[in-house]
Protein backbone atom coordinates (compact mmCIF):
# COMPACT_ATOMS: atom_id res chain seq x y z
CA UNK A 1 0.00 0.00 0.00
CA UNK A 2 1.29 3.48 -0.67
CA UNK A 3 -0.07 6.61 0.93
CA UNK A 4 0.80 9.95 2.47
CA UNK A 5 -1.66 9.37 5.32
CA UNK A 6 0.25 8.35 8.47
CA UNK A 7 -2.85 6.95 10.21
CA UNK A 8 -3.69 4.71 7.24
CA UNK A 9 -0.11 3.41 7.09
CA UNK A 10 -0.12 2.77 10.84
CA UNK A 11 -3.41 0.86 10.57
CA UNK A 12 -2.12 -1.26 7.66
CA UNK A 13 1.07 -2.04 9.60
CA UNK A 14 -0.95 -3.00 12.68
CA UNK A 15 -3.18 -5.39 10.71
CA UNK A 16 -0.32 -7.10 8.85
CA UNK A 17 1.67 -7.62 12.03
CA UNK A 18 -1.28 -9.49 13.60
CA UNK A 19 -0.43 -12.39 11.29
CA UNK A 20 2.12 -14.71 13.01
CA UNK A 21 5.65 -14.24 11.66
CA UNK A 22 4.72 -11.18 9.59
CA UNK A 23 6.17 -7.68 9.67
CA UNK A 24 6.25 -4.70 7.34
CA UNK A 25 8.90 -2.54 5.75
CA UNK A 26 8.43 1.08 4.75
CA UNK A 27 10.01 2.87 1.79
CA UNK A 28 9.76 6.50 0.70
CA UNK A 29 8.45 6.82 -2.86
CA UNK A 30 9.54 9.46 -5.40
CA UNK A 31 6.10 11.08 -5.00
CA UNK A 32 6.74 11.69 -1.30
CA UNK A 33 4.25 8.99 -0.30
CA UNK A 34 5.35 6.03 1.78
CA UNK A 35 5.09 2.45 0.60
CA UNK A 36 4.40 -0.19 3.25
CA UNK A 37 5.06 -3.79 2.25
CA UNK A 38 4.18 -7.04 4.02
CA UNK A 39 7.02 -9.49 4.53
CA UNK A 40 7.88 -12.41 6.73
CA UNK A 41 10.03 -11.57 9.74
CA UNK A 42 13.05 -13.53 8.47
CA UNK A 43 13.19 -11.99 4.97
CA UNK A 44 11.25 -11.30 1.80
CA UNK A 45 7.54 -12.10 1.47
CA UNK A 46 7.06 -15.59 0.02
CA UNK A 47 4.20 -18.04 -0.16
CA UNK A 48 6.06 -20.38 2.20
CA UNK A 49 7.72 -19.53 5.47
CA UNK A 50 9.57 -21.68 7.99
CA UNK A 51 8.37 -24.78 6.14
CA UNK A 52 4.73 -23.84 6.77
CA UNK A 53 2.20 -21.93 4.73
CA UNK A 54 2.23 -18.19 5.22
CA UNK A 55 -1.16 -17.36 6.82
CA UNK A 56 -1.56 -14.06 4.94
CA UNK A 57 -0.83 -15.76 1.61
CA UNK A 58 -3.32 -18.53 2.43
CA UNK A 59 -6.13 -16.04 3.08
CA UNK A 60 -5.45 -14.19 -0.17
CA UNK A 61 -5.22 -17.46 -2.12
CA UNK A 62 -8.37 -18.94 -0.50
CA UNK A 63 -10.52 -16.12 -1.83
CA UNK A 64 -8.99 -16.14 -5.32
CA UNK A 65 -7.30 -12.77 -4.87
CA UNK A 66 -3.69 -13.82 -5.43
CA UNK A 67 -1.90 -12.34 -8.43
CA UNK A 68 -4.96 -10.47 -9.77
CA UNK A 69 -4.46 -7.60 -12.18
CA UNK A 70 -6.31 -4.35 -11.44
CA UNK A 71 -8.93 -4.92 -14.16
CA UNK A 72 -9.60 -8.51 -12.92
CA UNK A 73 -10.40 -7.60 -9.31
CA UNK A 74 -13.76 -8.40 -7.75
CA UNK A 75 -15.30 -9.09 -4.35
CA UNK A 76 -15.51 -12.83 -3.56
CA UNK A 77 -19.15 -13.98 -3.64
CA UNK A 78 -19.03 -15.26 -0.05
CA UNK A 79 -18.32 -11.70 1.18
CA UNK A 80 -21.82 -10.57 0.20
CA UNK A 81 -23.31 -12.69 2.99
CA UNK A 82 -21.03 -11.26 5.70
CA UNK A 83 -22.71 -9.55 8.67
CA UNK A 84 -23.32 -5.82 8.17
CA UNK A 85 -20.51 -4.82 10.55
CA UNK A 86 -17.98 -6.79 8.49
CA UNK A 87 -19.35 -5.24 5.28
CA UNK A 88 -18.65 -1.82 6.84
CA UNK A 89 -15.07 -2.87 7.68
CA UNK A 90 -14.54 -4.09 4.11
CA UNK A 91 -15.97 -0.89 2.60
CA UNK A 92 -13.81 1.19 4.96
CA UNK A 93 -10.67 -0.62 3.81
CA UNK A 94 -11.62 -0.25 0.14
CA UNK A 95 -12.35 3.48 0.56
CA UNK A 96 -9.09 3.98 2.48
CA UNK A 97 -7.09 2.67 -0.45
CA UNK A 98 -8.92 3.80 -3.61
CA UNK A 99 -11.82 5.94 -2.44
CA UNK A 100 -12.16 9.70 -2.46
CA UNK A 101 -14.19 12.39 -0.75
CA UNK A 102 -14.83 15.54 -2.78
CA UNK A 103 -16.82 18.73 -2.54
CA UNK A 104 -19.00 19.73 -5.50
CA UNK A 105 -18.93 23.38 -6.49
CA UNK A 106 -22.48 24.64 -6.48
CA UNK A 107 -23.91 27.95 -7.66
CA UNK A 108 -25.76 28.35 -4.34
CA UNK A 109 -22.42 28.73 -2.58
CA UNK A 110 -22.92 25.43 -0.77
CA UNK A 111 -20.37 22.79 -1.61
CA UNK A 112 -21.93 19.45 -0.67
CA UNK A 113 -19.61 16.44 -0.27
CA UNK A 114 -19.75 13.30 -2.34
CA UNK A 115 -17.88 10.03 -2.09
CA UNK A 116 -16.43 8.11 -5.01
CA UNK A 117 -14.63 4.81 -5.54
CA UNK A 118 -12.77 4.39 -8.82
CA UNK A 119 -11.23 1.32 -10.50
CA UNK A 120 -10.49 -0.08 -13.95
CA UNK A 121 -12.48 -3.15 -12.88
CA UNK A 122 -16.15 -2.75 -13.73
CA UNK A 123 -16.93 -5.90 -11.76
CA UNK A 124 -15.26 -4.54 -8.61
CA UNK A 125 -17.12 -1.23 -8.85
CA UNK A 126 -20.46 -3.01 -9.34
CA UNK A 127 -19.62 -5.30 -6.40
CA UNK A 128 -19.00 -2.25 -4.23
CA UNK A 129 -22.32 -0.78 -5.35
CA UNK A 130 -23.94 -4.04 -4.23
CA UNK A 131 -22.18 -3.89 -0.83
CA UNK A 132 -23.33 -0.29 -0.39
CA UNK A 133 -26.93 -1.44 -0.80
CA UNK A 134 -26.37 -3.91 2.06
CA UNK A 135 -25.82 -0.92 4.39
CA UNK A 136 -28.65 1.14 2.94
CA UNK A 137 -26.62 3.39 0.63
CA UNK A 138 -27.39 3.95 -3.05
CA UNK A 139 -24.43 4.56 -5.34
CA UNK A 140 -24.45 5.38 -9.05
CA UNK A 141 -22.03 3.62 -11.42
CA UNK A 142 -20.55 5.54 -14.35
CA UNK A 143 -17.61 5.04 -16.69
CA UNK A 144 -15.15 7.34 -18.38
CA UNK A 145 -12.57 6.77 -21.09
CA UNK A 146 -9.12 7.83 -19.98
CA UNK A 147 -6.11 8.95 -21.96
CA UNK A 148 -2.47 9.67 -21.28
CA UNK A 149 0.48 11.17 -23.10
CA UNK A 150 3.56 9.06 -23.79
CA UNK A 151 6.59 10.73 -25.42
CA UNK A 152 4.39 13.54 -26.69
CA UNK A 153 1.80 11.20 -28.18
CA UNK A 154 -1.73 11.11 -26.73
CA UNK A 155 -2.90 7.52 -26.19
CA UNK A 156 -6.16 5.93 -25.12
CA UNK A 157 -6.14 4.47 -21.62
CA UNK A 158 -8.37 1.97 -19.89
CA UNK A 159 -11.96 2.75 -19.02
CA UNK A 160 -12.28 4.04 -15.46
CA UNK A 161 -15.34 2.83 -13.55
CA UNK A 162 -16.75 4.81 -10.62
CA UNK A 163 -19.41 4.33 -8.01
CA UNK A 164 -20.47 7.71 -6.64
CA UNK A 165 -22.54 8.52 -3.56
CA UNK A 166 -23.86 12.06 -3.88
CA UNK A 167 -27.20 12.34 -2.08
CA UNK A 168 -26.76 14.15 1.27
CA UNK A 169 -28.71 11.40 3.04
CA UNK A 170 -26.54 8.61 1.61
CA UNK A 171 -23.28 10.54 2.09
CA UNK A 172 -24.15 11.00 5.77
CA UNK A 173 -25.17 7.34 6.12
CA UNK A 174 -21.97 6.13 4.45
CA UNK A 175 -19.65 8.40 6.44
CA UNK A 176 -21.39 7.28 9.64
CA UNK A 177 -20.89 3.63 8.68
CA UNK A 178 -17.25 3.81 7.59
CA UNK A 179 -14.16 4.06 9.73
CA UNK A 180 -11.86 5.96 7.37
CA UNK A 181 -8.17 6.64 7.87
CA UNK A 182 -6.24 9.36 6.11
CA UNK A 183 -9.10 11.28 4.50
CA UNK A 184 -8.64 14.99 5.30
CA UNK A 185 -11.95 15.79 3.63
CA UNK A 186 -13.86 13.50 5.99
CA UNK A 187 -12.52 15.50 8.94
CA UNK A 188 -13.69 18.67 7.16
CA UNK A 189 -17.21 17.27 6.72
CA UNK A 190 -17.55 15.98 10.28
CA UNK A 191 -16.07 19.20 11.67
Kindly give the residue locations of the regions a language model identified.
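Internal intein/HINT superfamily modules and their associated LAGLIDADG
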Residues: 1-191
